[in-house]
Amino acid sequence: MTQAAKNARNPIDDTAPERSRPRVMMCPFTNPTNRYIQIQKDLYSSIGYDVVPLSIKGLLKGGLFQLFKPGNILAFHWLEYRPFKRDKGTARLSLTGTLLFAFYCTLMLIGRAKVVYFIHDHAVHDTVGFNRRLSMRIIALVRRLADFRVVHAPDFQAQYNAQYLPHPLYWDVPGQAPATLKKHGERPLFSLLGVIRPYKQIDALLDVWPSECVLSIAGHGTQAYLATLNEIIDKRALRSVVQLDARFLSDAEFAQSIADSDVLILPHTADSMLVSGAFFEAIGRVPLLISRATPFMVSAARKFDNVMLFDDIAELPRIVRSIGESWPAIGRNSGNLAIDEFGWNACRRRYGQFFETVEGHRRDSVEKPVVW
């Protein structure tokens, strides 16, 4: 049983009177493809907040008044994605999305509730050229409009003038059904899970993948990128060792795929996201992780002895083969350490302290620039 299941109270339970609880007005309020948003909502509820959607519909139903209560908080995640629309694997500027983004920026400017902006990415995924540079400018704008910024990677606190808060473990939250752990065999199963997109450089990985090692790739991807990957698999005759399961995985399927993995590979480029969500699904559950040496993963490797790093994709075959030769003795169990760092109770403590700081902050003392 996880620490959260044993020790945490109901995420929506609080002894304070309902009407006295401050509100977190959250955008987005739902995300059907990622449990992160639901976990965040449960965290806010567990530390004493009512969590409500920040949306046009909600504002019209009486939520507008809540914008002007200094004790309330506006929490934004991935707001920089609003001005863009993804089409055939590429994110491009959208007029309707830009107008919606401008609407949310206006709410930040006119309201008295504190604004907390969670920075997840250096740039919007799948943008190139002008759109990529624009997305970075948009992130910079929202950073300036926000009263507080949060990052899940401690090394980026100074760069983004942000507070570090741990990213919660997906498997250590109240109500999370445990996945069935498999018995690890004599031959390790390497896995690459989640969305199949160019920023993960899976094509470069397949170009050097050892033909004697088993690899499972699973997740939703665009037809164009999948065609590229299948072409490499066929060209290098990897069909017998590489399984490409190109479809959306439910939460239960993703969790079970993690549990079935012996080694998880995180090849994301350093200039895309600050942290990989898959890391927080895997750490403490998967015996080994291989990752590109991004700043967060370098710090993770200092804490967890089952995290192995590479700087260049050309180094990957040597690492993969060395694991195969040393398996299963090389596997590690880092569950307790992962709970100490990123578990539900650790997150409740850190988020509670941070939100107390936010509530004590005087909104009218912050100058809000409107140009960028």
List each model region and its residues.
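Conserved donor-binding/catalytic core segment of Leloir-type glycosyltransferases
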Residues: 181-200, 206-218
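A charged, aromatic-enriched C-terminal amphipathic alpha-helix characteristic of glycosyltransferases
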Residues: 314, 325-360
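Nucleotide-activated donor-binding/catalytic signature segment of Leloir-type glycosyltransferases, i.e.
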Residues: 228-252
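Nucleotide-sugar-dependent
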Residues: 265-280, 292-294, 298-300
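Conserved acidic donor-binding segment of nucleotide-sugar-dependent glycosyltransferases
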Residues: 303-314, 320-327
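Acidic donor-binding loop of glycosyltransferase active sites
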Residues: 256-273, 287
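Glycosyltransferase donor-sugar binding loop
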Residues: 215-229, 247
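Donor nucleotide-sugar binding/catalytic pocket of nucleotide-sugar-dependent glycosyltransferases
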Residues: 139-176
